[in-house]
A protein has these predicted regions:
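A contiguous active-site-proximal alpha/beta segment in oxidoreductase catalytic domains
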Residues: 142-223, 227, 234, 243-257, ...
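C-terminal helical cap and adjacent loop that interface with cofactors, partners, or active-site loops
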Residues: 281, 345, 367-378, 399, ...
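Sec-dependent signal peptide recognition
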Residues: 2-7
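Rossmann-like dinucleotide-binding domain that binds NAD(P)(H)
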Residues: 217-228, 234, 251-373, 409-413
Length: 537
């Protein structure tokens, strides 16, 4: 009964509670006054990579003394001192005592900027909304059913108070992803979205990501592996555990700042690894299926299967890859004999608005020389018993999730991400890998005349000229690769800037669109509900 009351209250708040002129924001210069709370990740600092006239140059920072704070301040200092397009942020730091209570008492701004700490994001956002602050988070806003309910309440309270609670999603602004979504909505070209089956989903997302990133620590040339879902910098060819050159001719090389393949994980621990990696993928899937439409998660999402399992990393491989003499204390809880059993792998199959969907996340140890590569054979990890750890080197396409593997370059070196949408007339496959620009491949349905299909594809791309002019195609096996002009590509800082600008627009509006709220809740319901249920069982 309590749950029903909460949901009804939230639904009531989301439906029509917005009133004209409810926002104090007008778009005036410097009116958005940032409060940075407990910084911990790169994306948070990237929000300040460029000056925005709507954001006040004085930023108040509340955080405990430590590496997270110092790393954030170092990045801001780098932005302020770079030779070109230098910023002029004035950072006012408070790092003593109970920083959260002090911030809530002083409230020296109107927008709280939260960083990548999944464990605390829900509590921080609830406290800020309760204190009358808008919230922009670079961290997933919920992990576990209690935090999901807290997010529901916070969104309802934000709407009641005329505040905006929003999660930064720069992945939405990648041009290849936008083109994939646009083509999927072109019924004449794509046809209807096929439904698939539990055994063979029609929408498939697969990710193979590093469990750690190698970072230089302080002095000398020693390296240390830091736990979390972080990836090698895009320009770091030595970080490719397969030993293959990232500048493969099948891919366009990405600029160094295009995508750092990192997640805000240093302070998260490994327990939220699957959620952190899967959240942006599910966000893209929802946009592909629904566009900017509302989702009723308790009606339009049903779960087929879900499991999380650890990656088994031999301790000797960790020590060799990290150059460490001994296992750090943070990893001791994951030690089993001479093997580290590190959480983060997982597979989720569910039905989204009638479409069977599969999401797979797997991890590897960079520097071990045994990263998994994409193949069409089922993975050992996919068929292992649930109580058995899968080797971090297990390779292959997850069993049954073969949509998007036909007709595109195979044997992709890790890290890589793939998102495939199977339609009546074509399959749209977005492929990303570290060090290369994301590519969009279009595979015609079986029996389709290739020449006519190419003409149809060019016509469909021509209709997207307002979104991206100058698109072309080139054959790639039995598929066609969409050739995207270089000027249409944006680096990660620019995508973060676009996401932040969208948030500022919502501040002026006074509330986010209903579809944003619905899709945020649907995303976390998808990420949390099936795994909580499986643990209870």
């Amino acid at each position: 009964m309590k749950r029903s009351i909460i949901l009804l209250a939230c639904t009531t708040l989301f439906c029509g509670c917005g009133t004209p002129n409810r926002s104090a924001f007008t778009g005036a210069r410097g009116e958005a006054e940032l409060i940075v709370l407990h910084p911990a990740d790169e994306q948070l600092a990237q929000v300040q990579s460029r000056m925005n006239p709507q954001i006040n140059r004085t930023v108040h920072v509340f955080a405990p003394e430590g590496e997270g704070l110092q790393s954030y301040l170092a990045r801001i200092n780098a932005f302020n001192s770079r030779p070109d397009s230098a910023t002029s942020w004035n950072e006012v730091v408070s790092n003593e005592g109970d920083f959260l209570a002090r911030m809530l008492g002083e409230k020296p701004g109107n927008v709280a900027l939260l960083s990548g700490r999944t464990a605390t994001a829900a509590g921080y956002s609830a406290a800020c909304i309760g204190a009358g602050l808008n919230v922009l988070s670079t961290a997933p806003l919920a992990s576990g059913t209690p935090k999901f309910r807290e997010l529901e309440r916070s969104l309802g309270l934000a709407d009641e108070k005329g505040l905006v609670l929003y999660e930064l999603m720069p992945e939405r602004y990648e041009i290849a992803a936008l083109l994939q979504q646009a083509l999927a909505r072109n019924a004449d070209f794509f046809g209807i979205q096929l439904c698939g089956s539990p055994e063979a989903p029609a929408i498939v997302s697969e990710s193979v990501l590093p469990l750690f990133t190698v970072r230089m620590e302080g002095t000398g040339s020693s390296t240390a592996l830091r736990p979390g879902i972080t990836g090698p910098p895009a320009n770091d060819k030595t970080a490719n555990a397969t030993g293959e050159n990232r500048d493969n001719s099948a891919f366009e090389t990405a600029p160094a700042d295009y995508d750092d393949w990192s997640y805000p994980a240093d302070s998260l621990g490994l327990q939220n690894a699957f959620l952190l990696a899967a959240a942006p993928r599910i966000d893209l899937i929802q946009l592909a299926v629904f566009g900017r439409e509302r989702i009723k998660y308790n009606r339009q999402i049903q779960f087929t299967s879900a499991r999380q399992y650890p990656a088994a990393v031999p301790e000797r491989e960790y020590l060799r890859a990290s150059g460490s003499a001994a296992l750090p204390p943070a990893l001791q809880p994951y030690r089993s004999g001479d093997t580290l059993r590190l959480p983060g792998n997982g597979e989720l199959r569910y039905v989204l608005n009638g479409v069977h969907t599969g999401v797979s996340i797997r991890h590897y140890l960079p520097g071990s020389g045994t990263a998994p590569a994409q193949r069409e054979s089922p993975a050992t990890a996919a068929t292992a018993p649930e109580d058995k750890a899968a080797s971090h080197a297990d390779a292959g396409t997850t069993a049954g999730m073969t949509v998007g593997t036909t007709g595109i370059p195979q044997a992709l070196p890790a890290p890589y991400r793939k998102l495939a949408l199977q339609g009546e007339k074509a399959t749209l496959t977005l492929v990303e890998r570290g060090g290369a620009l994301p590519q969009l491949y279009i595979v015609p349905a079986p029996g389709t005349d290739s020449t006519r299909f190419a003409q149809s594809l060019l016509a469909a791309l021509g209709q997207l000229a307002p979104l991206c002019p100058g698109l072309g195609i080139e054959p790639a096996g039995t598929a066609f690769r969409v050739v995207i002009p270089a000027e249409a590509r944006t680096a990660l800082p620019q995508r973060i800037e676009k996401a932040a600008s969208q948030y500022l627009d919502y501040l002026v509006q006074g509330y986010p669109p209903f579809w944003e709220v619905d899709q945020m809740l649907a995303k976390y319901y998808t990420l949390i509900r099936p795994f909580d249920e499986s643990q209870q069982q």
